[in-house]
Amino acid sequence: MEAVETQEQATEQDRGTVKITICKSLSGIAEGAELVYQEFEKQIKELEANAELGPGGCSMGQVGCRGYCSKDVLVDVYVPGQDPVTYEKVKPDMVIKILKDHIIGGKVFKKAAAKEDYYENIKKQQRVALEFGGKIDPENIDEYIEVGGYSGLKKALQMKPSDIIEDIIASGLRGKGGGGFVTGYKWKKAANAPTDDLGTRYIMVNGDEGNPASYMDRSVMEGCPHQVVEGLIIGAYAIQATEGIIYTRSDYAIAVRRLNMALKQARERGLLGKNIGGTDFSFDIYVHEGMEAFIGGESTALMASVEGKRPFPKAQPPHSTEKGLWGKPTLLNNAETWATVSAILKKGSKWYSSMGNDNAKGTKVWALSGNIKYNGLMEFDMSTTFREVIEDVCGGISKKKELKVIHAGGVTGGFLPPSKADTPLDYESLLNEGVLMGQASFAAYDESACVIDLAKFSVGFNEAETCGKCTPCRIGLTLIKNKLDDISEGRGKLEDLDKLQSLCEEINVTALCGLGETAVKAVLTGIKYFRAEYERHIVDQTCDAARCTGLYKYVVKEEDCVACGACIKPCPTGAITGGTRKVAAHIDMDLCINCNACYEACAFLAIV
């Protein structure tokens, strides 16, 4: 393939003696990456005009997301003969110091330099789908080819389609969008499904993420769109698909732009279109921008959206591999899965299956949040446990507090207690504990979190996002939310817990689609593992975390108040008086809205 043969030429291109790259992911841009980039360009131009830089000068570049969103804007400096240095939380006013101290003076600007834990964090990951995040320009096909991009496709085009499918089966790859179905067997079903006289068969990328805590697919598509495109072409050749569609949300503007750019570049290199790589295989891809709805990510609803219909889920079977888009066999995997396919073809199925455990091979990208020191996107071997991620990679629970609850799987996931922290992050291990991997986000919370409050958010989100087609979701979720409101506001009864559990179990087995089935996991696992906390809300009318403010009237213990005034400023209604000049604070409950701001502000536990 001519496009891949340019790798050696690309490697030899002069990129300047010193190279500076800036993270231009969505979070990076939100933190001011464009301003930082412009400041670098401006300062480099001035330094070059004054002959202050070396003869090689500096080259500028952009890179995609590497997952460390809390550290943006990230800047990497590559000086020949030295280890690369990453700078974090860079602002425009730091640019001149980085240039003068590091590039001209030869000394790292330590104030902004990433600490050792940043590098250790990366070493503890196994990055496959995120391999090129932070390393290459996502808008430059030559940089992707330079690191081995499209070599997996080159290898695939020299194989029989059926052999590619067997290779994917041997790798142990499973879908990374929730259910974890074995990818190779899904491909085989699509490849063997009867077609029309024209052999019409579709292949798709599910790049839609409705879970508010999940952004893995967006980051993969933004950070290395060619990796997704290459995987999709390989899959298309394996099942002999006639057309490819990348379905993503219209509000993923950066991902959409970069995907379209990648498709254009691939066509120009002969990697898409007629007779790909000199073979008789012809195939093309287009991007479909869908609506911003949680239900839009469900496979049958997604296909209905592409067909121009309202995105309602359909009962299965028949499955989409037999009768999908416009009634034709359709293969659908998410963006992370397609990015992994290209790596497997390039490095081999044995390489991929060497990672993971007996339940699941390979790796998974997780979106991490909560009361942990480091959050963002990280990719781990499937055998990694919650405890290893929280303590070894994420720096443990912040502010030296204790882990109380792990919320795994986002709004369709569930809760686990600290005693389950040694559970591996694979499909079966999670399922055995009553939670699903779902869209692979997990949050670790300390004792300031309330399980009932967290469950209210999950159920409330799912209630708002339900398509309303089936009664279990449309009516059941509202009933559950009302019961949770009663418990959190002092109207709950002990018998409500059994009613809640029974109702959730009914929805779990009768909902039309997978999203409905999992919409109640937060309540089921909450009652299973944190029943005592539910009972304290009902019997004692107390919330240990003081999150369920409907249970409380706030009182200042005068003997503990030091009159520091810390509680006055955060009060949004001016309900607090005193608190200064040795006069204890006082809360006017007629003005208090139970927002909990004063409780959180008091360092002396004087507000109860």
Regions found by a protein language model. Give the residues of each.
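Short amphipathic, charge-patterned alpha-helical segments
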Residues: 231-233, 382-398
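C-terminal accessory/binding modules appended to enzymatic or scaffolding proteins
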Residues: 360-374, 386, 544-582, 586-589, ...
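Histidine-anchored nucleotide/phosphate-binding helix
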Residues: 224-238
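Flexible inter-domain linker/hinge segments
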Residues: 110-170, 333-348
